[in-house]
């Protein structure tokens, strides 16, 4: 993977350029991290005024699943690095772009292609690497889906193979749920006529995200892996609501988690941050999913670590030394839109920031939806429990109002 010998000046012919494919709240923080290191940032999304658009040097609106549009933009900009920040991309074209040497795909084009859907990454994890996972079946039709659910037993979980943030995901408790779950999975998929994965229910004690960083070890000049402290999180309908770090684990469970994370990220290759999602039952660890990019539950690292997951991602991509030191226990709590409106306004910032050791990130998305993440509160404290209370209190103080209805 390419390592620049120097960093050029933005907006000049010798600029070192990064192109973000996906410009949401995570991409916004990545863009800021790269700008702090002196790189020229090009942010791409499917709609105007996305969060990262607002902080990048250049912004573009294209259909990122359209191979021709992706290629035209890469050939026009000629970025040094193309950094996927979402799954729904023309990954076959990224493979060609990488093979032709037009740009370095982060972490690799193969990783982007494998992780764009649950089928590719699950087969790599379970069938090629032999990692422990739940029992599962992939299905293309309702008939296959119904048979798989009966085979795996109830309760089980169904997800589209291509979706994000819990869209289309549901728990089946009996055969009475089959039709509704199938219809919901089809509506939540990113592509029409999507396949689904049906997973046997895993009885787990808790779930974690283990942020795994691949960069160059400055002492050996060779690729190496670092692990952030484990992040616990709570989900509702498949979407994260709050996260905290560190998540208390037994030494054996942590060792097993790091082993699973190292094996899957080594198989994907390249450099950067990987969000490895794991189920933990006692000392046993089960692989769930992996994202070859910063993870939404990792927003907590804005408060807890010396360098956030976004700063670590930027440094690792460039092959620079990384520092995963935890400086304080902390937590994050999501601020949802709660309404359907464009050009919303926010109140309650003073009340939220009056909570001790607390900060906010308002994502500045141009349109709010009831369950759309519009911001996050991050807090630190002497322990995780106190930090969770603080973050939840601060997030609840923020109110989202339609249009310009809020008073200044």
From Swiss-Prot:
Pathway: Purine metabolism; IMP biosynthesis via de novo pathway; N(2)-formyl-N(1)-(5-phospho-D-ribosyl)glycinamide from N(1)-(5-phospho-D-ribosyl)glycinamide (formate route): step 1/1
Enzyme class: ligase
Residue sites binding N(1)-(5-phospho-beta-D-ribosyl)glycinamide per the record: 25-26, 85, 296, 365, 372-373
Catalytic activity: N(1)-(5-phospho-beta-D-ribosyl)glycinamide + formate + ATP = N(2)-formyl-N(1)-(5-phospho-beta-D-ribosyl)glycinamide + ADP + phosphate + H(+)
Any GO BP annotation: 'de novo' IMP biosynthetic process
Pfam families, alphabetized: ATP-grasp (PF02222), PurT_C (PF21244), RS_preATP-grasp-like (PF22660)
InterPro entries xrefs: ATP-grasp (IPR011761), ATP-grasp_carboxylate-amine (IPR003135), ATP_grasp_subdomain_1 (IPR013815), PreATP-grasp_dom_sf (IPR016185), PurT (IPR005862), PurT/PurK_preATP-grasp (IPR054350), PurT_C (IPR048740), Rudment_hybrid_motif (IPR011054)
Self-association state and partner proteins as the record states: Homodimer.
Main function: Involved in the de novo purine biosynthesis. Catalyzes the transfer of formate to 5-phospho-ribosyl-glycinamide (GAR), producing 5-phospho-ribosyl-N-formylglycinamide (FGAR). Formate is provided by PurU via hydrolysis of 10-formyl-tetrahydrofolate.
Full protein name: Formate-dependent phosphoribosylglycinamide formyltransferase
Organism from which the protein derives: Corynebacterium glutamicum (strain ATCC 13032 / DSM 20300 / JCM 1318 / BCRC 11384 / CCUG 27702 / LMG 3730 / NBRC 12168 / NCIMB 10025 / NRRL B-2784 / 534)
């Amino acid at each position: 993977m390419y390592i620049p010998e120097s960093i050029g000046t933005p907006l000049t012919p010798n600029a070192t350029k990064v192109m973000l494919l996906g410009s949401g709240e995570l991409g916004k923080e990545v863009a800021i991290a790269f700008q702090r290191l002196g790189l020229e940032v090009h942010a791409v999304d499917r709609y105007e005024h996305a969060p990262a658009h607002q902080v990048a040097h250049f912004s573009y609106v294209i259909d990122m699943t359209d191979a021709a549009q992706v290629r035209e933009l890469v050939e026009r900009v000629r970025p040094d690095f193309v950094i996927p920040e979402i799954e729904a991309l023309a990954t076959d074209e990224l493979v060609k772009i990488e093979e032709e040497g037009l740009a370095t795909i982060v972490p690799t084009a193969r990783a982007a292609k494998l992780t764009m859907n649950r089928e590719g990454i699950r087969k790599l994890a379970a069938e090629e690497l032999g990692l422990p996972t739940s029992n599962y079946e992939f299905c293309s039709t309702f008939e296959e889906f119904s048979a798989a659910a009966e085979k795996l037993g109830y309760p089980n979980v169904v997800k589209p193979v291509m979706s994000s943030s819990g869209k289309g995901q549901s728990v089946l408790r009996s055969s009475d749920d089959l039709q509704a779950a199938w219809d919901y999975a089809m509506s939540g998929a990113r592509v029409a006529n999507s396949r689904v994965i049906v997973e046997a229910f895993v009885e787990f004690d808790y779930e974690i995200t283990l942020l795994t960083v691949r960069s160059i070890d400055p002492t050996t000049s060779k690729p190496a892996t670092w692990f952030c402290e484990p992040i616990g999180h709570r989900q509702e309908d498949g979407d994260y609501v709050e996260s905290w770090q560190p998540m208390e684990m037994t030494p054996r469970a942590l060792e097993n988690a790091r082993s699973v994370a190292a094996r899957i990220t080594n198989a994907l290759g390249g450099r950067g941050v990987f969000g490895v999602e794991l189920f933990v039952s006692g000392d046993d660890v089960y692989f769930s999913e992996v994202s070859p990019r910063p993870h939404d539950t990792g927003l907590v690292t804005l408060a807890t670590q010396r360098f956030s997951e976004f700063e670590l991602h930027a440094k690792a991509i460039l092959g620079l030394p990384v520092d995963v030191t935890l400086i304080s226990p902390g937590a994050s709590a999501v601020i949802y839109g709660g309404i359907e409106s464009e050009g919303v306004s926010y109140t309650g910032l003073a009340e939220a920031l009056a909570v001790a050791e607390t900060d906010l990130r308002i994502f500045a998305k141009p349109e709010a939806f009831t369950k759309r993440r519009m911001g996050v509160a991050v807090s630190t404290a002497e322990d995780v429990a106190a930090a969770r209370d603080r973050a939840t209190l601060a997030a609840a103080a923020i109110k989202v109002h339609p249009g310009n209805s809020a008073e200044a």
